[in-house]
Amino acid sequence: MAKRSNTTMTSAGLQLGREVAPPDSPETAKLDRVPNPQRDTDYLARFTVPEFTSLCPVTGQPDFAHLVIDYAPGPWLVESKSLKLYLASFRNHGAFHEDCTVAIGKRLTAEIKPKWLRIGGYWYPRGGIPIDVFWQTGRLPKGLWVPDQGVAPYRGRG
C-alpha cells in the first residue's frame, strides 16, 4: 500500500485540530468533508449518537434520541468532529422529531454526496409515546453489507 502524505487528507479550512466555538444553530453549523481514499470500494460507515438532544418547538422541553447514521461513501467522507459539532447544534434548536431526523439525513447527503445513506432516529418517549423516524436516500448498493442498526424497539418496563 502506498504511503499517504498527511497533507493530502487535511485542509486549512477543517475544524479538526482547532479550537472551534459551538455553532449557534444547525443552519450555521459547518460540516467538513475529506476525500474518500477508498472511493472505488463499496463499504459502510456508521455513526452512532446515543445522546442526541433537541428541543420541542412547542413546549421548549428537551427531547432525546439515539441516532444511527449509516452511509456508503462516495467521493467524500464526513469529518467526525464537524459532525459532532453539527449534531450538538440541535441542543438549543426547536424542531419536531421527524424534522430533526430527516433534516440531518438531507444535510449530510447534500454535503458528502454518498452512494447511499440512511438515518434511524429512535426518540425516547414524551407524553408516553416513543417516536422512531427512518429516512434513506434510495436503493442500497448491490452487495453492500449493512448490519441491523441494533436499537431495540422501546419497551419501557414491559
Swiss-Prot record:
Residues 1-37 are annotated as: Disordered. Gene3D superfamilies: 3.30.1130.10. It catalyses: 7-aminomethyl-7-carbaguanine + 2 NADP(+) = 7-cyano-7-deazaguanine + 2 NADPH + 3 H(+). Its main location: cytoplasm. One of its GO terms (cellular component) is cytoplasm. Residues 27-37 have a biased composition (Basic and acidic residues). Catalyzes the NADPH-dependent reduction of 7-cyano-7-deazaguanine (preQ0) to 7-aminomethyl-7-deazaguanine (preQ1). Belongs to the GTP cyclohydrolase I family. QueF type 1 subfamily. This is NADPH-dependent 7-cyano-7-deazaguanine reductase. The gene is queF.
